[in-house]
Amino acid sequence: MSLSNKLSVKDLDVAGKRVFIRVDFNVPLDGKTITNNQRIVAALPTIKYVEEHKPKYIVLASHLGRPNGERNDKYSLAPVATELEKLLGQKVTFLNDCVGPEVTKAVENAKDGEIFLLENLRYHIEEEGSSKDKDGKKVKADPEAVKKFRQELTSLADVYINDAFGTAHRAHSSMVGLEVPQRAAGFLMSKELEYFAKALENPERPFLAILGGAKVSDKIQLIDNLLDKVDMLIVGGGMAFTFKKILNKMPIGDSLFDEAGAKNVEHLVEKAKKNNVELILPVDFVTADKFDKDAKTSSATDAEGIPDNWMGLDCGPKSVELFQQAVAKAKTIVWNGPPGVFEFEKFANGTKSLLDAAVKSAENGNIVIIGGGDTATVAKKYGVVEKLSHVSTGGGASLELLEGKDLPGVVALSNKN
């Protein structure tokens, strides 16, 4: 799956055409009030660009929450239509469904350049292909119904644009099922692909990956794939304790230990050696007597280990120095997962120091990419999103890319040629 060879919105001629844009308007709601409109704002450049190029009409489609294949007013996109009108400064016609006669009739009578927002795609089981019954058991959608649903979505479009990177790892109907000749990436999707291509297809070296997070078992595939690509790998966060216990027989007290992941540590370290990857682990820790923002704190080195009833919640000053040295050497950096419990101020120093080093690296012209999820939250919390090369909008999608998996939503896009 090539990331750098996908058709982009700028390669399209949309004049007089019916344009379908899959956006990510999965915004947090409090009742009918949108509490954060960032995802809507992020989609504006693509919508405005298409609108400026005189399409017949634009149809916007998204999911919101998990309505589980049935209509549920709690997950209606109606409030999004109102917000979008404000942001665009023009009328947005909200349709009460995403397929069916009402939708067909509305688009057939569209005024030139009209913008429609469809109701939540996930009101139909055919979007995700399955739902859960009241006992939590998976119920599969009828394949014929899925086919019909996809045909109905396709009938609204001459051109398809996908700007929902956060859902790109899901083979949902609106992501892979529109059979039109040109399927292009919107500006958000294009930026994601461009930066991940810079890291995964043709990185400037030295290439450093920074991994944090709790469980080794969640990140085995990620570490395994990155060991074929990087020159240096920092393993921090909770999963460092599993590595330290297995490799150095270090006492870790009540720190996180991942029984399942532990079985893979030696194989991963062997692979790092074989591939000449410098593996960098923390050598000292900020410890706590409990998992709490008001915990008593102490410090421990890896030579002493962490005493019983204490746990490591951040890396210590010597580790910070090691990590900063690696960052200073690197020309390409991918960071997924914080090195400490940054949510508690007492254990945020490791994360803040690493973030400062990453910002400095980006300011020096290096490529610094933050995978979505917790690390993106860190970048937002400390107000440095604009200072880094790229902060991904898709936690799960960016993780699967870094694991070396193909993303169905990207595979479905047309290639440039």
From Swiss-Prot:
Cite the binding residues for AMP: A214, K215, K219, G238, G312, E343
Molecular functions (GO terms): ADP binding; ATP binding; metal ion binding; phosphoglycerate kinase activity
Q: Name one GO biological process term.
A: symbiont-mediated perturbation of host immune response
Q: Look up the domain of life of the source.
A: Eukaryota
- Which compartment or compartments is the protein found in? Cytoplasm; Secreted, Cell wall; Mitochondrion
What does the entry list under GO cellular component?
cell surface; cytoplasm; cytosol; external side of plasma membrane; extracellular region; fungal biofilm matrix; fungal-type cell wall; hyphal cell wall
The residues that hold Mg(2+) are A214, D218, D374
Task: List the SUPFAM superfamilies hit by this protein, alphabetically.
Answer: Phosphoglycerate kinase
Residues that bind ADP: G213, G237, F342
Sites where the protein binds (2R)-3-phosphoglycerate: V23, D24, F25, N26, Q38, R39, S62, H63, G65, R66, L121, R122, H169, R170
Q: Part of which pathway?
A: Carbohydrate degradation; glycolysis; pyruvate from D-glyceraldehyde 3-phosphate: step 2/5
Write down the chemical reaction(s) this protein catalyses: (2R)-3-phosphoglycerate + ATP = (2R)-3-phospho-glyceroyl phosphate + ADP
- Name where it mostly resides: cytoplasm
User: What cofactor(s) does the depicted protein rely on?
Assistant: Mg(2+)
Q: Where does CDP bind?
A: G213, D218, G237, G337, F342
Role: Catalyzes one of the two ATP producing reactions in the glycolytic pathway via the reversible conversion of 1,3-diphosphoglycerate to 3-phosphoglycerate. Both L- and D- forms of purine and pyrimidine nucleotides can be used as substrates, but the activity is much lower on pyrimidines. Negatively regulates the biosynthesis of acetyl-CoA from pyruvate in the mitochondrion.
Give the UniProt family note.
Belongs to the phosphoglycerate kinase family.
Protein name listed in UniProt: Phosphoglycerate kinase
Q: Which organism is it from?
A: Candida albicans (strain SC5314 / ATCC MYA-2876) (Yeast)
The gene coding this protein: PGK1
